[in-house]
């Protein structure tokens, strides 16, 4: 099992990825995401199923957003050069209000640096509400 140092590194990448996305810092975000063609990032919107390049392009076009993503708690697991994490966070609005969000991600170590190769965010819906 990987030590706390590696977990701290992975958590730092997760936090810095969200900070870059929240700030609209496309260059910084690009440095955190894997450029593998099979990298995928799935958002809460039904149409958000993107490559790393598409995510960076969207952030560059939008700049900072009034909706911010915050990672509150994460469990991080590491096996060699692969790490995965699941946790809870929230989306907050500049004008007030927030929604809980569930997040997962997979990171791989590329050239000694942890990079996000997969991410997913979802807002939970009670099973009874799926089909009403």
Regions found by a protein language model. Name each.
Residues 79, 94, 109-113:
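Flexible loop/coil segments at beta-strand boundaries within sensory signal-transduction domains
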Residues 1-35, 128-130:
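Short, low-complexity N-terminal intrinsically disordered segments enriched in polar/charged residues
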Residues 17, 55, 59, 71-76, ...:
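Hydrophobic/aromatic beta-strand elements that line small-molecule binding cavities or substrate pockets
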């Amino acid at each position: 099992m990987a030590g706390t140092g590696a977990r701290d590194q992975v958590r730092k990448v997760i936090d810095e990825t969200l900070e870059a996305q929240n700030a609209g810092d496309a260059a910084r975000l690009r440095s955190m995401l894997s450029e593998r063609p099979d990298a995928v990032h799935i958002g809460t919107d039904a149409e958000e199923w993107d490559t790393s390049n598409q995510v960076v392009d969207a952030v560059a076009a939008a700049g900072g957003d009034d909706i911010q993503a915050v990672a509150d708690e994460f469990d991080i697991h590491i096996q060699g050069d692969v790490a995965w994490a699941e946790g809870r966070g929230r989306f907050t609005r500049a004008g007030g209000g927030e929604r809980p969000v569930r997040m997962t991600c997979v990171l791989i170590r590329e050239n000694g640096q942890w990079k996000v190769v997969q991410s997913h965010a979802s807002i939970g819906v009670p099973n009874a509400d799926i089909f009403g």
